[in-house]
């Protein structure tokens, strides 16, 4: 049994030889959540957007290798993003975002989860190391309240120039944004939930009252406050303490 640390006052994990895992919370904290912050790539959607962009130049394998190392915490996120974005230089950006909106696949259970959270008057946001056009698209599609992500630089011929513009949304920035949103809405961070799959999501998981690693990379699962390895992100509602009947009422 791994007992709670100071950063994990209400949750911990139990792993047994038969590979069963429990998520344990204090009863008083389960249904009091007021803020949800999600990662985008491999969390709200199945894909990694930067790899979809890389496919336009047939370099997705090269980009995917760097992405995997970054998500495992083997590379500094800012450095890995710069390396990957540089590889995208020259790709025509005139129609890429409209095309990608048709290609992205929303993760199973996400629409239902967001609908339920909206009924519960919970503030929702996406804080992504990906890119703002698709984060904004998902914000509108899912009824989120906030969207933060990176911006790709574009040259005079409307092609990607291999750079990003503005502050990088890395692990530190995600945690900062969560705290900023909580402060704006007068929400105690202990009433916030952070959901992601990569190493750059860990910091926001730890500043939130409850952090969930969703089908995360193995190294991330070892460090995360709690892990959820199921086929539907809406299973978070069970962790929050809702039963089948209550969930049906929230989703219908």
Enumerate the language-model features and the residues they cover.
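Alpha-helical substrate-recognition element adjacent to the catalytic core
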Residues: 1-8, 13-152, 231
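C-terminal cap/substrate-recognition subdomain and adjoining C-terminal extension
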Residues: 12, 98-252
């Amino acid at each position: 049994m791994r007992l709670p640390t100071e950063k994990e006052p209400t949750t911990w994990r139990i792993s047994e030889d038969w590979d069963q895992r429990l998520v344990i919370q204090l009863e008083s904290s389960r249904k009091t959540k007021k803020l949800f912050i999600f990662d985008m790539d491999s969390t709200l959607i199945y894909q990694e957007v930067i790899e979809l962009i890389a496919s336009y130049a047939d370099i997705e394998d090269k980009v995917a290798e760097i992405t995997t190392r970054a998500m495992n915490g083997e590379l500094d996120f800012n450095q890995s993003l710069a390396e990957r974005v540089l590889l995208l230089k020259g790709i025509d950006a005139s129609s890429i975002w409209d095309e990608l909106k048709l290609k992205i696949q929303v993760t199973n259970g996400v629409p239902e989860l967001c609908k339920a959270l909206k009924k519960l008057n919970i503030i929702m946001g996406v804080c992504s190391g990906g890119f703002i056009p698709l984060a904004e698209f998902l914000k509108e599609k899912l009824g989120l309240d906030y969207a933060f992500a990176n911006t790709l630089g574009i040259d005079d011929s409307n092609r990607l120039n291999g750079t990003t513009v503005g502050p990088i949304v890395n692990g530190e920035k995600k945690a900062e944004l969560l705290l900023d949103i909580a402060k704006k809405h007068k929400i105690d961070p202990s009433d916030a939930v952070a959901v992601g799959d990569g190493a750059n999501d860990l910091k926001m998981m730890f500043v939130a009252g409850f952090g969930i690693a969703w089908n995360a990379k193995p190294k991330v699962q070892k460090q995360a406050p709690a892990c959820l390895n199921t086929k539907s992100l809406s299973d978070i509602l069970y962790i929050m303490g809702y039963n089948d009947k209550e969930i049906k009422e929230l989703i219908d």
